[in-house]
Amino acid sequence: MSTGIWVLIVIIAAVLGFVGGFFAARKYMEDYLKKNPPINEQMMRTMMIQMGQKPSEKKLHQMMNAMKNNYGKK
């Protein structure tokens, strides 16, 4: 086989590797963030107290559900 064909095969393999790696990393991060959200109810409660709001359970659940729904749409 000629050198040109080998170069073409290497370039195609590299592009496929980059594309596959990108999608695998993206899927891994989405799953990781679903299992370990960057903010939880206790953090939300603390933020609301610091802002001078009384954190009711209903309000906390509404905010957490809104965040989960927002993340799922991306």
Swiss-Prot record:
TM region(s), chain numbering: 5-25
Similarity remark: Belongs to the UPF0154 family.
Location of the protein in the cell: Cell membrane
Protein name, per record: UPF0154 protein LSL_0542
Main location: membrane
GO annotation, cellular component aspect: plasma membrane
Domain of life of the native organism: Bacteria
Keywords assigned: Cell membrane, Membrane, Transmembrane, Transmembrane helix
InterPro entries named among the record's database cross-references: UPF0154 (IPR005359)
Membrane topology listed for this record: Single-pass membrane protein
Pfam families to which the protein is assigned, alphabetical: UPF0154
